[in-house]
């Protein structure tokens, strides 16, 4: 069987609908027995010797002509894993759900006729840039320079915890160059709120408490410290510029969501976050890492992979807090996916 390429679509004649769509989920019917398939679908049929050519072209020529090599790598991999999938093209099945996607992948055992989508997949090369605002409810299929595939699931994920907050009032605090010190009445802050760190070390049972500027600003706003919030924020801006305001907005939002954020420095992130907390003496592992980014941030796939790999390696989720100048936050969770 020879296909015909016209206006970016390959037309297959004869009994193509019965052979390729009705039984195996390729293309879209056009009436009768004929079938329209996308170039990547035609390339897959060529690779299986299910059709003889497209306008006399074999697989090599078709991929070069249509520029679908990366799409073919992903399409074939998902087919090999047992999925039926459709290209996200106008007029193809499920296209209403296909914004920012290249393929719609159906649950195993289902196809385009069932109306159920398992994954919305976008194909990305290793060196392409990825606007963070374009992510969420889509799976990234990243093809590296060797042709290997890595899948990342991206979805909105508002933080939520069970940590109760019980703050003291008007504790004396001393504002330093990059932190604050609280000398008296610190047990309630530290033991029951996990604010700060003991100046004498994490294993100390007593002594003054050192607070990050983020913690100090948050506590000053809540009148737990007898210092001016504006002074703390000004000091924070001196230390890290406007980024301090974004990080403070995220810190406050995490606390308001009944989670406990702490420094994520050791994990290369802004925060590590505990969703369950009762006391420092009964501390569990943190559940996810947070990196604060601007809404117009652009990822390089290699950096995204590094963040997600590191989080997964320590059994945590990677969450990005897209934070604008007004402190509005959209949350994005990214994790490795094996389809």
Swiss-Prot record:
One of its GO terms (cellular component) is cytoplasm. One of its GO terms (molecular function) is tRNA-intron endonuclease activity. Its EC number is 4.6.1.16. Keywords: Lyase, tRNA processing. It holds the Pfam family tRNA_int_endo. Optimum pH is 6.5-8.5. Its cofactor is Ca(2+); Mg(2+). One of its GO terms (biological process) is tRNA splicing, via endonucleolytic cleavage and ligation. InterPro entries: tRNA_endonuc-like_dom_sf, tRNA_intron_Endo_cat-like_sf, tRNA_intron_Endonuc_cat-like, tRNA_intron_Endonuc_N, tRNA_intron_Endonuc_N_sf, tRNA_splic, tRNA_splic_arch_long. It catalyses: pretRNA = a 3'-half-tRNA molecule with a 5'-OH end + a 5'-half-tRNA molecule with a 2',3'-cyclic phosphate end + an intron with a 2',3'-cyclic phosphate and a 5'-hydroxyl terminus. The N-terminus is blocked. The active site is at 274, 285, 316. Divalent cations; Ca(2+) better than Mg(2+). Belongs to the tRNA-intron endonuclease family. Archaeal long subfamily. PANTHER family: TRNA-SPLICING ENDONUCLEASE SUBUNIT SEN2. Homodimer. NCBIfam families: endA (TIGR00324), PRK09300.1-1 (NF006794). Endonuclease that removes tRNA introns. Cleaves pre-tRNA at the 5'- and 3'-splice sites to release the intron. The products are an intron and two tRNA half-molecules bearing 2',3' cyclic phosphate and 5'-OH termini. Recognizes a pseudosymmetric substrate in which 2 bulged loops of 3 bases are separated by a stem of 4 bp. This is tRNA-splicing endonuclease. It comes from Haloferax volcanii (strain ATCC 29605 / DSM 3757 / JCM 8879 / NBRC 14742 / NCIMB 2012 / VKM B-1768 / DS2).
């Amino acid at each position: 069987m020879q296909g015909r390429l016209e206006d970016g679509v390959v037309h297959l004649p004869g009994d193509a609908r019965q052979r390729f769509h009705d039984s195996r989920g390729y293309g879209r019917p056009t009436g009768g027995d004929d079938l329209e398939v996308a170039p990547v679908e035609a390339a897959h049929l060529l690779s299986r010797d299910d059709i003889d050519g497209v306008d006399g072209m074999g697989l090599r020529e078709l991929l070069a002509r249509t520029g679908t090599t990366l799409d073919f790598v992903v399409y074939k991999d998902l087919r090999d894993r047992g999925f039926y999938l459709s290209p996200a093209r106008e007029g193809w099945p499920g296209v209403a759900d296909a914004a920012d996607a290249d393929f719609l992948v159906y649950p195993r055992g289902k196809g385009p006729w069932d109306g159920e989508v398992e994954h919305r997949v976008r194909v990305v090369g290793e060196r392409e840039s990825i606007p963070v605002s374009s992510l969420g409810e889509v799976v990234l299929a990243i093809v590296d320079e060797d042709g290997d595939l890595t899948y990342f699931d991206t979805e909105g994920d508002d933080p939520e915890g069970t940590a109760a907050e019980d703050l003291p009032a008007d504790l004396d605090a001393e504002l330093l160059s990059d932190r604050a010190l609280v000398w008296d009445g610190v047990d309630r802050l530290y033991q029951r709120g996990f604010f700060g760190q003991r100046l004498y070390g994490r294993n100390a049972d007593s002594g003054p408490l050192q607070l990050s500027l983020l913690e100090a600003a948050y506590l000053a706003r809540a009148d737990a410290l007898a210092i001016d919030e504006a002074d703390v924020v000004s000091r924070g801006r001196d230390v890290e510029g406007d980024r301090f305001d974004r990080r403070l907005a995220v810190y406050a939002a995490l606390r308001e969501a009944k989670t406990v954020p702490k420094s994520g420095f050791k994990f290369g992130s802004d925060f590590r976050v505990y969703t369950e907390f009762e006391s420092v003496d009964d501390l569990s592992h943190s559940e996810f890492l947070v990196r604060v980014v601007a809404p117009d941030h652009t990822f390089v796939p290699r950096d995204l992979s590094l963040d997600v790999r590191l989080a997964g390696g320590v059994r945590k989720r990677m969450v990005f807090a897209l934070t604008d100048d007004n402190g509005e936050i959209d949350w994005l969770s990214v994790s490795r996916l094996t389809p």
